[in-house]
C-alpha cells in the first residue's frame, strides 16, 4: 500500500504559512511563494544581523568624531591618545557620553590631553 504524506504535508505547510504572516498577497497565502519568500527573508535577516553591527560602529565613530571636533581634535588622534593612556572605554560608551553626558566626555578628553 502506498504511503501518503497527508498529515506531514499539512503540518509542514501550516508551519511555513504561519511564518509567512505579514507578507503581501500570494506570498502569504500560497505555499510555494510563501516558502520562497521565507527563504529570502531568512537570508536577509541573517545578513542584516551582521550588517547591524557595522552600521552601529560607524554611527558611534561619527558621534565621537563630532564631539572631538567641538574640542579641536580629530577622532583618530583621540582614539590613539586613549590607547596610549591605557583608557579602556569602547566606542559605544564614548558615543553615549558624547551624546548624553558631555561633561564626562570632556573629562575623558582632558585625561588624555597630554597624549594628543
Curated annotation (Swiss-Prot):
Family as reported in the entry's similarity comment: Belongs to the bacterial ribosomal protein bL20 family.
**Listed InterPro entries:** Ribosomal_bL20, RIBOSOMAL_L20_CS, Ribosomal_protein_bL20_C
The record's function comment reads: Binds directly to 23S ribosomal RNA and is necessary for the in vitro assembly process of the 50S ribosomal subunit. It is not involved in the protein synthesizing functions of that subunit.
Domain of life of the organism encoding this protein: Bacteria
**Do you know which Pfam families this protein is assigned to?**
Ribosomal_L20 (PF00453)
Is this entry keyworded Ribosomal protein?
A: yes
- Which is one GO molecular function term here? structural constituent of ribosome
CC terms in the record's Gene Ontology section = ribonucleoprotein complex; ribosome
Protein name, per record: Large ribosomal subunit protein bL20
Q: Which UniProt keywords apply?
A: Ribonucleoprotein, Ribosomal protein, RNA-binding, rRNA-binding
Q: Which gene produces this protein?
A: rplT
What lineage, starting at the top, does this entry show?
A: Bacteria, Pseudomonadati, Campylobacterota, Epsilonproteobacteria, Campylobacterales
Origin organism is Helicobacter pylori (strain Shi470)
Q: Which GO terms describe its biological process?
A: ribosomal large subunit assembly; translation
Amino acid at each position: 500500500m502506498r504511503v501518503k504524506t497527508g498529515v506531514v504535508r499539512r503540518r509542514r505547510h501550516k508551519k511555513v504559512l504561519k511564518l509567512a504572516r505579514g507578507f503581501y498577497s500570494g506570498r502569504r497565502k500560497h505555499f510555494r511563494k510563501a516558502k520562497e519568500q521565507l527563504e529570502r527573508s531568512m537570508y536577509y535577516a541573517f545578513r542584516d544581523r551582521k550588517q547591524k553591527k557595522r552600521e552601529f560602529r560607524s554611527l558611534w565613530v561619527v558621534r565621537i568624531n563630532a564631539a572631538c571636533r567641538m574640542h579641536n581634535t580629530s577622532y583618530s588622534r583621540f582614539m590613539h591618545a586613549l590607547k596610549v593612556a591605557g583608557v579602556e572605554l569602547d566606542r559605544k560608551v564614548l558615543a553615549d557620553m558624547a551624546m548624553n553626558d558631555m561633561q564626562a566626555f570632556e573629562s575623558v578628553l582632558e585625561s588624555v590631553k597630554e597624549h594628543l
